[in-house]
Amino acid sequence: YGEAPVVAKTDLFHALPDLAQPQESVTPQAMERMGQSYGYMLYSAVLESSLELNSLKLFKAADRAIAFIDKQRAMTAYDRELEVRHEVGPFHGKNMHLDILVENMGRVNYGPYLNWQRKGIDGCVMINDRFAQHNWKQYALPMTNLDQLNFEAGYEEGLPAFYQVEFNVDEPADTFLDMTGWGKGFVVVNAFNLGRFWEEGPQRRLYLPGALLKPGKNELLIFETEGKHKATVILCDTPDLGDE
């Protein structure tokens, strides 16, 4: 089907009021404690003291976290990287906004850890080697209500964001979405969650069955977390499973 253009976009922070209502607590709460099983969690706090922020450490966090200070990307950590202290910034100021987006990347379905898995942050956050006791706001983001998105809410470059792509089909047929140039996230096709993509590979293209398409206008909804995107998505006729 060739190239399909991005026709609208909005970043996660502008979209939040349409997707989730915050739940507050003194310390961050795991995804499961918020009644959620999959997707993402966003943790937000205002650092009221005037300080120079130069390190972050998350306790009992899973699986992948991106931290922002006043919407500036400060840290990205995955799996065992979450267990260590990370130098950031430094960031200076008072009333700085700390936002941590945590992705649930899957669950173990066997063995001794079956009943002990917690996603999101189930411990605390350490700032400058001190435990941060703040009024945390937690936003549960299972991404099941994307029809509520308002693409006119606003957009800032470099932030996690939603992208709307449209293309026309005469006769539905199998195709492959080439996600080269996009960072990490997932794709929804005509309200069906097609799957995840990641520039780390090895797979470069997502298989899109023709059964998910319809004659006329079709829609892709892409959520991307790394601030990496293109103006188009290419729909190809061959797969790309990466380097052999």
Place the predicted regions along the sequence by residue:
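Aromatic-lined ligand-binding clefts that engage carbohydrates, nucleic acids, or primary amines
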Residues: 53-68, 98, 167-190, 197-198, ...
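Short beta-strands within extracellular/lumenal beta-sheet-rich domains
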Residues: 37-48, 158-170, 204-206
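Short, surface-exposed tryptophan/glycine-enriched loops
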Residues: 85-97, 162-170, 205-217
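Aromatic-rich membrane-interfacial microdomains
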Residues: 74-83, 195-206
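C-terminal effector modules of nucleic-acid-centric enzymes and ribosome-associated factors
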Residues: 156, 160, 183-184, 193
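Carbohydrate-binding surfaces of carbohydrate-active enzymes
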Residues: 1-132, 143-153, 221, 225-228, ...
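Terminal leader/tail segments of proteins
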Residues: 176, 206-244
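Composition- and surface-driven signal marking solvent-exposed, interaction-prone regions
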Residues: 69-72, 79-80, 112-114, 180, ...
